[in-house]
């Protein structure tokens, strides 16, 4: 039986996002009452049009053209032209998982009922997701200041029967992809192009998948760290609960508890419990709970922010059917990607720290000046064989230290570059997983950005 989830704009989790992104058989549907809520929002838009109100992006142009009025008989043309003009991304296509995450998130935030879009348009987006019609979305072209306009426009193109889509591994014109899936393209009405392309779902979708990968990297780092401690004949005494209670950060306590569990009944530890002249281990061994725990704390906060973003209305203007006698249409700035960009900076730092301390443990394992009784570079035949001499150097190059400086502050006009940062973290996370496990990124989500 395929999995099924229901969306309502309020309760989507990161685990739901990963499931839909990585398992194309998962079916997504509206929760009861969701379509009625969207319809009420749409009725506010229709009422504003009937009354001749001036509404940004509905009866006016966009951006610098916001003061330009649009004739009533050209309102639909305005919306389709918006999608066509803004679908100008470049670079390799987003991965299938990233695309599916983005589609799910866009449908979910529209399901909140604050965007003034007809339910049938969002249903068609879900139909595409369920049928495996995946818009081809270039990775590059968004700076996050007004949301992810270019990527979301590429998504919307297929919805209207244009652009390109991947279906079953084959890239097709959007109209043909929809035809093969038995889906009718939609014709956008007033407000609907803007509702589809104004938001943060590109960076938030990638960020959600990267976070799930990072959570696995932490788990792998603790397994690798416990094995390193055994190999170096270290002691888990520094992980004692009393030490953790003296500095009660939740992540630190969780890491220490897991390390104690991994090292419980270790025969290697018992072999040198008595008569060992060493007083304490090196930082990279002794401080694992503090460093890994800081990463755990960071990931918990990032999860909270990304789950909030996954259930947030991020377009402009927003429609509030329950405000005032006839509802309100209000221009705001929920499209700005700074909340996501900021936590993605934190994710980059956390992953880089995990990779860095892991690389230092690798150095201690292979360096004959640091590795105690272990053979130089972990080879039985040093000289003829170099062992893991260069593996440590390679690990050093994979720590991400050269590409993790903050991206959220890189522009004085408040573009946050969160989308570019999400792409960089894909590299950082893959490198961190390689450093921690030596297994070609097996611990990470993998492929959150490019195929």
Segments predicted by a language model, with ranges:
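Glycine-/small-residue-rich beta-strand-loop submotif within the FAD-binding core of flavoenzymes
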Residues: 11-24, 68-98, 127, 131, ...
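Glycine-rich anion/phosphate-binding loop at the beta-strand->alpha-helix junction
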Residues: 145-155, 160, 298, 302, ...
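Mobile "lid/hinge" segments at catalytic clefts and subdomain interfaces of large enzymes
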Residues: 151-260, 264, 405-416, 431-441, ...
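FAD-binding glycine-rich core of flavoenzymes that anchor FAD
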Residues: 114-140
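Accessory "access/gating" subregions that flank catalytic or transport cores
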Residues: 229-356, 372
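A structural-propensity feature for long, helix-poor, extended segments
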Residues: 86-116, 174-208, 278, 370-436
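N- or domain-start disorder-to-order transition segments that initiate the globular core
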Residues: 1-52
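FAD-binding core of FAD-dependent oxidoreductases
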Residues: 56-70, 74-78, 85-108, 136-160, ...
């Amino acid at each position: 039986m395929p999995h099924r989830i229901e969306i309502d704009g309020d309760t989507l989790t990161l685990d739901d996002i990963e499931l839909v992104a990585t398992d194309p058989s998962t079916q997504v549907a509206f929760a009861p009452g969701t379509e009625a809520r969207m319809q009420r929002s749409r009725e506010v838009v229709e009422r504003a049009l009937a009354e001749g109100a001036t509404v940004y992006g509905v009866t006016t142009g966009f951006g610098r053209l916001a003061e330009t009025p649009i004739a009533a008989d050209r309102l639909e043309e305005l919306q389709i032209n918006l999608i066509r003009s803004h679908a100008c991304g470049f670079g390799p296509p987003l991965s299938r998982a990233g695309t599916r995450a983005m589609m799910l998130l866009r449908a979910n935030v529209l399901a909140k009922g604050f965007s003034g879009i007809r339910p049938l348009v969002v249903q068609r987006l879900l139909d595409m997701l369920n049928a495996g019609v995946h818009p081809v979305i270039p990775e590059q072209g968004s700076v996050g200041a007004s949301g992810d306009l270019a990527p979301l426009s590429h998504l919307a193109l297929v919805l209207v029967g244009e652009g390109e889509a991947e279906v079953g591994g084959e890239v097709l014109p959007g109209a043909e992809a929809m035809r093969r899936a038995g889906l009718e393209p939609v014709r956008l009405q007033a407000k609907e192009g803007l509702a589809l392309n104004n938001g943060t779902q590109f960076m938030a979708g990638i960020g959600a998948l990267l976070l799930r990968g990072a959570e696995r990297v932490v788990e792998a780092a603790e397994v690798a760290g416990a094995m390193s401690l055994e190999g170096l004949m270290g002691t888990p005494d520094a992980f004692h609960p009393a030490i953790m209670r003296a500095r009660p950060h939740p992540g630190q306590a969780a890491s220490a508890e897991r390390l104690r569990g991994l090292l419980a009944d270790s025969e290697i530890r018992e072999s040198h419990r008595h008569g060992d002249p060493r007083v304490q281990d090196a930082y990279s061994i002794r401080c694992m709970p503090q460093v890994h725990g800081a990463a755990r704390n960071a990931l918990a906060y990032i999860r909270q922010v990304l789950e909030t973003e996954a259930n947030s209305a991020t377009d402009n203007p927003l429609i509030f059917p329950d405000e005032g006698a006839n509802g309100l249409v209000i221009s705001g700035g929920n499209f700005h990607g700074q909340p996501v960009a900021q936590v993605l900076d934190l994710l980059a730092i956390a992953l880089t720290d995990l990779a860095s301390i892991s690389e230092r443990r690798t150095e201690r394992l292979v360096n004959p000046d640091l590795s105690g009784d272990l053979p130089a570079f972990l080879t039985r035949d040093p000289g003829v064989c170099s062992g893991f001499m260069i593996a440590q150097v390679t690990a050093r190059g994979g720590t991400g230290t050269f590409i993790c400086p903050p991206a959220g502050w890189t522009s004085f006009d408040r573009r946050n570059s969160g989308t570019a940062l999400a792409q960089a973290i894909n590299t950082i996370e893959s490198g961190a997983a390689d450093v921690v496990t030596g297994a070609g990124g097996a611990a990470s989500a993998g492929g959150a950005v490019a195929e």
